[in-house]
Amino acid sequence: PAAQDEFRVQVTATTYPVYALACAVSAGVEGVSVSRLNTGQVSCLHDYTLTVSDMARLEQADLVLINGAGLEAFLDGVLDQLDAPLGDCSVGIDLLEADGQLHSHGEDGEIGHSHDHDPHYWMDPRNAAVMADTIAQALSQADPDNAGRYQANASLAAEALTNAYAAWTTSLSGLSYPYLITFHDGFRYFAHAFDLELLFAMEEEDGATASAKDILTASNLVKQYHLPAVFMEVNGSGSAARAVAGETGSAVSTLTMLMDGADAPNEAGAVDILTQLYLSPMEQNIKTLMEVLK
């Protein structure tokens, strides 16, 4: 598009959480555009294939920001060919080990995840604050004249994230049922952040259905802990969750992994953007837990 000429710095983010934080950190800086790959429609990025428009966004970028930690397997072989510098948002994050014991994959015989670490670290707001700082550093290198603005925005974002985390921790500290059973394996950092015990996590990927054994395991845990609800991810299939609910009488509630969301509003400040794109959906998760696990 001709409009791209207006931008001095074109930033491409590979995932929605990286996009959300990059928009907040670059708020108010003229001539910076942040776009994202079209990864929002899948619950699990292992099912994702690059589109032609994605490829164009990557090739036109002056800076490419990735989640890292093994999440972007779909970019293997692509990133090396790009001219743009790469900002890896997982740098400086205390990553959890990928724990094969905790999550189970559908029975298509293929285990798609071979990460050494769990890459879903943005689900802990404290990690999102680290991401904001990493993004500010990457933007400052791409656009040194505005380094002060990026750092100031990252500081504002970190403060808002820290305050939200403190409030949410207090809200969740009194749950009668501080336990999660999730039908997506991306909630470990979230559980860890808020001192919830993730009893069982399983993921139904494209073409794979939950095994009878997994449904039985989850159902037994629901009964053992008297859980009022199990949780599916907003983009996930939900069939296994419904099977467990049918077996146990528990409810099925929905949580978001923030894989998709609204575009950043124009002319908004760092905290407003962060609130709309990250804090509000995360707050919805907190409210859901307070409603169903109280």
Which role does the model predict for each range below?
Residues P1-K294:
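Extracytoplasmic metal-acquisition and chelation regions
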